[in-house]
From Swiss-Prot:
Lineage: Eukaryota, Fungi, Dikarya, Ascomycota, Taphrinomycotina
Family stated for the protein in its record: Belongs to the peptidase C19 family.
Active site: 120 (nucleophile), 222 (nucleophile), 464 (proton acceptor)
The protein, known as: Ubiquitin carboxyl-terminal hydrolase 5
Assigned keywords, A-Z: Hydrolase, Nucleus, Protease, Thiol protease, Ubl conjugation pathway
E.C. no: 3.4.19.12
Disruption phenotype: Simultaneous knockout of ubp15 abolishes cleavage of the sde2 propeptide. Simultaneous knockout of ubp15 leads to abnormal splicing of introns featuring long spacing between the branchpoint and 3'-splice site. Simultaneous knockout of ubp15 leads to a growth defect and thermal stress sensitivity.
Length: 1108
């Protein structure tokens, strides 16, 4: 038995019935009220920033828990104007055995059901408690946006059954006592000022919701998208961009024209806008679009480029007037009348975040005066060294003020860039006059209003950028996150982007301190007295006509496609294979439905689902130019063997398009048909597409032309299945323009990899040919004119079919980009081709011998180079493509052209030696192919060839082996190459003079490199002489000479003695005796330094360039 009541009902019943108000009930009532207040407060504290539009507590009295069905539903209850009910699974759902499950279900109103677009934002808590002692309970909370997609929400594992049914202590009853429990729901309805609170965005349309559209992300261009949107919303900037002359042929290739097109599309399109054309105008390739860059740097490069486009035009200096202010750097002497000052323009201001509380602190720090005194005095002309004041002061502020917050800084302790996530506040409005020079024009307005916050979310190496922007003078805020634009609250603009820590208060749990990973890094302020000018909307009349003429058709086409997508559920899509299309088809089946590119070439129709098929016929006739009386339609279906063939004629003329589609394809979205064109007298008299009378089978015909080396569609035939196959030979010869009595080979195309030869004396029935089957014919013998073609191509349809079933399109890419070769190319190959033949074809393509090509497989997940393909003539192309352990193959193979043949390579080994030319500051890599039976002396010969002017043969040289940056052993010139571990690094040098003539007690040690932790060893170790009684200050001078590191690197190195075996480190002071510390520790010298000198340049670290 179950009953339910709301908070109001229960309180009224207790208060109005005086006879029940004994002391026990008073206590229960007070305890219940206390719990209700506490839970309501817990919920509000968890989401304090959302305004509540309704709250209700509903208690469901369950008196016989063990008798409940597997799924029980509570009475319906109201929260304000909204209706809810509870769905309870006492023994849990199928996925939550051992738990009890509870869900809150929203009941939409009739109006909401009709609109099918609604959202109800709720925060709720469930409490299961003991009816006699409500404090014995278990609770949990959640929040959800109820919508047509999500009608219920809750907990599959709300509580363990043993926690409900068992005593937690001998004197404590279970929560479910004698089968009774109270299941209480506390439901808060929250206002949704933005319309997207907890939205799934599955059916979200930015244009409809906000009036604005986003920008597509090309991979890592979110930083660019956020900046472009912040510039676009400033109407004055947009107006200037439109006024740049771009109507000349040269102008249409410019960045300015691409930006105009981008802005125009943002203004008038209803879908997210692509930036591909814009980045192409920058001269960027696909790699550039996957590189994260600094927004400030990108902004400056873009503005510089636009300024160049504005020279000698009516908008020259327009950007300067918008974005540029002036500041003065000065040094003023305290005791004499002397000042050195320089005024300069600025486009943005970089403000410190670390150690600052807010924007005002940063500005005060920026203009803080530094005193130059003592050893740091300023040298003034004619006055000598003087005490002085040094600083920066602003002389003017621009109408548009970009403030760059320095969220990314270099940490010298950790020797790396880090993100500063400290809390940093910025206001909606501020007055910059306090930071203006006293000598500047004090009448200028310096009040600014916040119009943009550009945000970085994440850490230094894995982040995302988006923007919060105010698009109108008195309008709301919007969040621009790539393709999506949504309304935003002031809290999202300010508090959520201050950074720092915040306290989360999950209901029924302890508070949790969390760190925000999103923080503002650029602020856009507009000067208050210029708002009307800056935000005056750009009208269509202000846009150049050539831009409208160029873009309006594409916008209209995009809108048409968008409308089609939105209305696609109302239409049936028809793919109609015509005789013309079939005659141009050169693959298996009657069309290639598995190839998206080729599928687009099939004639397409879009017809309302409710339309009759008889209404579809005249539409086809008009579009394709066929007479209706000669048209017969056939269903095209997928057979069990995965081929696509005609099945039967369409007889359902009075059925709807949806009904016709469902005859053979109830699950698919596309109706596929074949259109037969037949003379009127061959159609059935009723013209209602009845079955074809005495013609028992409708056969498709293909012809193999040896001259063109193609199989093509050659029409269709209605045949009597009792006729012999030879009966159609004259007609086939006529269609192929062959002599009437030409002997023919005829095959049945069953499926890829299965083509059968047909015996002409057999009937169609005996050959099991029926409607939709495909036959292919060819002359039995090639003609004299075809002999040369046959010798270099396919001499029969069977061989071409065999190739078609095994062909694969392979993309060949160079293994190393810097090779002087074709960047990449495609080849259509037989997957059974052997390795040697594959290399021959590649060699012909590349103009190089086949034995000078080495192939490498491709990882299908990362598209990076995998394993080198062994030089094995038995390996097939199929085995190379499927060589990865992943189930999916890759159609990419990497190649490299070799200086030596692969056969020589089998006898030789590529050996790499790092030659110390000038200490460790100049290391050259020497590579040589050495016979596997050779020795180090052969390798040394390659070094001498590399450095012919060094006269190395007359000098004492050393070659040594290094493993994982640790010295291993010296190698003599007679050391055999085959004895050297391929994983070792070989290092060579001319032996320093001080190591050739050691004094008594001097010794040579190996010096290693590490960074902070000796486990982080790196670099190339080197030999060094340590001397008795020598202080480290002198040792350091010799180390500088030995390494030849520049001062910028050597000055930051920390020197120490390391015992790697016992993990001990002793850092050296200038007065230490180096020799004694090494002997005492039984260790070696080491340099604690960052791994910079050996770091390869990262292509992702390169500066922004706009090459156009």
């Amino acid at each position: 038995m179950v009953t339910g009541e709301t908070l109001v009902d229960s309180q009224k019943s207790l208060i109005n019935n005086d006879t029940l108000l004994n002391e026990k009930l008073k206590e229960d009532f007070e305890e219940n009220v206390s719990i209700d207040v506490k839970i309501h407060e817990e919920l509000r504290r968890a989401l304090p920033d959302y305004e509540e539009s309704g709250f209700q507590r509903f208690t469901w009295h369950i008196k016989s828990w063990h008798e409940l069905d597997r799924r029980a539903v509570s009475p319906q209850f109201a929260v304000g104007s909204r209706q809810f009910k509870i769905t309870y699974f006492p023994q849990g759902t199928l996925q939550s055995a051992g738990f009890t499950s509870i869900f809150l279900e929203y009941i939409p109103s009739e109006e909401e059901k009709l609109s099918n677009k609604y959202g109800c934002c709720c925060q709720f808590a469930f409490v299961i408690s003991n009816p006699r002692k409500p404090s014995l309970s278990v609770a949990n909370s959640a929040h959800c946006r109820f919508s047509p997609e999500i009608v219920d929400w809750g907990f599959t594992q709300f509580a363990e059954l043993k926690k409900l049914l068992c005593r937690q202590a001998p004197d404590v009853p279970p929560i479910v006592e004698d089968g009774a429990l109270l299941l209480t729901a506390y439901v808060r309805i929250l206002k949704d000022p933005t319309g997207v609170l907890w939205h799934s965005f599955n059916d979200y349309d930015s244009k409809i919701a906000t009036g604005y559209v986003g920008l597509k992300n090309q991979g890592a261009t979110c930083y660019m998208n956020s900046l472009l949107q912040s510039l676009y919303i400033i109407h004055a900037f947009r107006r200037i961009v439109y006024q740049i002359p771009t109507d000349s042929p040269q102008g249409k290739d410019s960045i300015a024209y691409a930006l105009q097109r981008c802005f125009y599309n943002l203004q008038f399109m209803n879908e997210p806008v692509s930036t591909t054309e814009l980045t192409k105008s920058f001269g960027w390739d696909s790699l550039d679009s996957f590189m994260q860059h600094d927004v400030q740097e990108f902004n400056r490069v873009l503005q510089d480029n636009l300024e160049r486009s504005m020279r000698d035009t009516k908008v020259e200096n327009a950007l300067t007037n918008l974005f540029v202010g002036k500041m003065k750097s000065y040094i003023a002497c305290v005791n004499v009348n002397f000042e050195s000052a320089r005024s300069e323009d600025y486009w943005d201001i970089q403000l410190n975040v670390k150690g600052m509380k807010n924007l005002e602190d940063s500005f005060r720090s920026y203009i803080q005066v530094e005193t130059l005194e003592g050893d740091n005095c300023y040298f003034a002309d004619t006055y000598g060294f003087q005490e002085a004041k040094k600083g920066v002061i602003f002389e003017s502020f621009p109408p548009i003020l970009h403030l760059q917050l320095k969220r990314f800084e270099y940490d010298f302790e950790r020797d790396m860039m880090i993100k500063i996530n400290d809390r940093y506040e910025f206001p909606l409005e501020f007055d910059a006059k306090a930071f203006l020079s006293p000598e500047a024009d004090q009448s200028q307005n310096c009040e600014y209003v916040l119009y943009g916050v550009l945000v970085h979310s994440g850490d230094l190496h894995n982040g995302h950028y988006y923007a919060l922007l105010k698009t109108e003078k008195d309008g709301p805020w919007y969040k621009y996150d790539d393709t999506r634009v949504t309304r935003a609250t002031l809290r999202e603009v300010l508090e959520e982007n201050y950074g720092g820590d915040y306290i989360m208060h999950p209901p029924f749990r302890s508070p949790v301190k969390l760190k925000r990973f999103m923080s503002a890094y650029m602020l856009l302020y507009l000067r208050k007295d210029k708002l009307d000018e800056l935000m005056n909307p750009v009208s269509a009349d202000e846009i150049p006509e050539h831009l409208k003429e160029a873009l309006n058709p594409s916008i209209q086409l995009a809108e048409l496609r968008r409308k089609e997508r939105l209305e696609s559920h109302l239409y049936t899509k028809v793919q109609l294979i015509t005789p013309e299309f079939y005659s141009e088809h050169h693959e298996f089946d009657i069309a290639d439905f598995g190839n998206a590119y080729k599928e687009e070439t099939i004639p397409q129709f879009r017809i309302k689902k409710e339309a009759k098929f008889s209404e579809f016929i005249p539409i086809v006739a008009e579009k394709l130019g066929y007479p209706q009386e000669c048209m017969r339609f056939w269903y095209v279906v997928k057979r069990h063997n995965c081929t696509v063939r005609v099945e039967s004629p369409v007889n359902e003329l009075n059925s709807t398009m949806e009904e016709v589609k469902n005859v053979w394809n109830s699950q698919g979205e596309i109706l596929r048909l074949y259109l037969e064109i037949t003379p009127e007298n061959e159609l059935s008299s009723s013209l209602t597409h009845q079955n074809t009378g005495e013609w028992n089978a409708f056969i498709f015909v293909k012809y193999f032309d040896r001259k063109s080396q193609e199989i093509s569609g050659c029409g269709t035939l209605h045949v009597n299945k009792s006729d012999e196959i030879r009966s159609i030979c004259p007609l086939l010869c006529e269609r192929a323009n062959l002599p009437k009595n030409t002997p023919l080979n005829i095959y049945e195309e069953i499926k890829p990899g299965m083509v059968d030869f047909l015996r002409l004396e057999k009937t169609f029935t005996q050959s099991e040919l029926s409607t939709g089957d495909i036959i292919c014919f060819e002359p039995c013998r090639p003609s004299a004119l075809e002999d040369d073609i046959v010798n270099s191509g396919f001499d029969s349809a069977l061989k071409l079919y065999d190739f078609l079933s095994n062909k694969v399109l392979v993309l060949f890419r160079p293994r190393f980009i810097d090779q002087d070769s074709i960047i990449e190319f495609e080849m259509l190959l037989d997957r059974r081709i052997k390795y040697d033949d594959l290399c021959i074809e590649l060699g012909q393509k590349l103009g190089i011998g086949a034995d000078h090509i080495r192939l490498t497989t491709c990882n299908p997940l990362t598209y990076s180079a995998g394993m080198v393909v062994p030089n094995d003539s038995n390996i097939t192309l199929y085995e190379i493509l499927y060589s990865s352990e992943e189930e999916m193959p890759s159609n990419v193979i990497f190649y490299e052209t070799m200086d030596v043949s692969l056969s020589d390579l089998d006898r030789k080994r590529l050996v790499r030696l790092r030659w110390l030319v000038d200490g460790l500051a100049n290391i050259e890599l020497v590579e040589a192919y050495i016979n596997k039976s050779g020795d180090i002396n052969d390798l040394f010969g390659a070094v001498c060839e590399r450095f012919p002017d060094s006269d190395l043969r007359k000098k004492k040289v050393r070659v040594y082996e290094v493993f994982e940056s640790r010295y291993h052993r010296d190698l003599s010139l007679r050391t055999l190459i085959r004895t050297i571990n391929p994983a070792a690094t070989l290092v060579g040098e001319v032996v320093p003079l001080d190591q050739l003539q050691l004094y008594p007690e001097e010794k040579i040690v190996q010096v290693h490199h590490f960074h902070k932790d000796i486990a982080r060893i790196h670099g190339i170790p080197f030999s060094f002489v340590i001397k008795p009684q020598e202080k480290f200050i002198d040792t350091k001078l010799r180390l500088a000479a030995r390494t030849q590191y520049p001062e910028s690197i050597f000055s930051v190195i920390k020197f120490c003695v390391v015992d790697f075996d016992n993990n001990r480190v002793v850092y050296l002071n200038d007065e230490d005796i180096t020799y004694d510390v090494v002997e005492k520790l039984n260790g070696t010298l080491a340099l604690d330094r960052a791994k910079k000198d050996s770091k390869k340049p990262n292509i992702l670290d390169r500066a922004i360039q706009m090459k156009n």
